[in-house]
């Protein structure tokens, strides 16, 4: 009898741990890059086709948002990003990192939904995203004026998350 009960008990304990991890809504995975400089890169601007490097980000606090047209979460957060980019009380550039996407679809998407980005960099092979430790889109990074990563959010960004998680860090940086 004990031989039959013990596997059931172990099974239910494991299922409990699984259920807890599935319903844990913490989308801030620890990143080994927090407190470190942004990775070096040279990428082409999606709109102007100019080349940009990580050095250009240094000098002001900014957000880097990893997105793609095929990403459902990116569409969910996009309206908030447009609002954020137009907020005169919050002067923070949003740099878009278009990840593994089709250039024409990405340009069309921005034309139709609005372009919240001060610069839109394209990462067609995803190499720069890998250097940032990106798991999937959307992901957003808060970068200080020295190019140091202070915060990483995985998933769609909205006002609640921005005010709860990013604004306090911004306050410390200012």
Residue ranges and their predicted role:
Residues 1-44, 174:
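N-terminal targeting signals for export/organelle localization
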Residues 3-4, 76, 134:
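Hydrophobic alpha-helical transmembrane segments of integral membrane proteins
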Residues 40, 91-92, 117-118:
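A generic structural signal for alpha->beta connector loops
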Residues 41-62:
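A short beta-strand-turn-helix
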Residues 60-62, 66-70, 136:
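Short pre-active-site segment immediately N-terminal to redox-active cysteine/selenocysteine motifs
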Residues 75-114, 124-131:
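Structural microenvironment flanking redox-active thiols in thiol-disulfide oxidoreductases
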Residues 111-116, 123-174:
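Thiol/disulfide oxidoreductase modules built on the thioredoxin-like
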């Amino acid at each position: 009898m004990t031989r039959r009960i013990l596997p059931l008990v172990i099974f239910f304990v494991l299922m409990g741990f699984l259920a807890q991890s599935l319903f844990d809504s913490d989308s801030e995975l620890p990143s080994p890059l927090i407190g470190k400089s942004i990775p070096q890169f040279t990428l082409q601007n999606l709109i102007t086709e100019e080349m940009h490097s990580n050095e250009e980000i240094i000098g002001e606090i900014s957000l880097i948002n990893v997105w793609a047209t095929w990403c459902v979460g990116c569409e969910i957060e996009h309206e908030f990003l447009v609002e954020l980019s137009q907020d005169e009380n919050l002067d923070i550039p949003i740099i878009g990192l278009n990840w593994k996407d089709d250039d024409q679809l990405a340009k069309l998407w921005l034309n139709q939904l609005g372009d919240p980005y001060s610069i839109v960099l394209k990462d067609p092979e995803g190499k720069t995203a890998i250097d940032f430790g990106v798991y999937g889109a959307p992901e957003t990074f808060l970068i200080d004026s020295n190019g140091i990563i202070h915060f990483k959010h995985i998933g769609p960004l909205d006002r609640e998350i921005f005010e709860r998680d990013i604004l306090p860090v911004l306050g410390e940086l200012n």
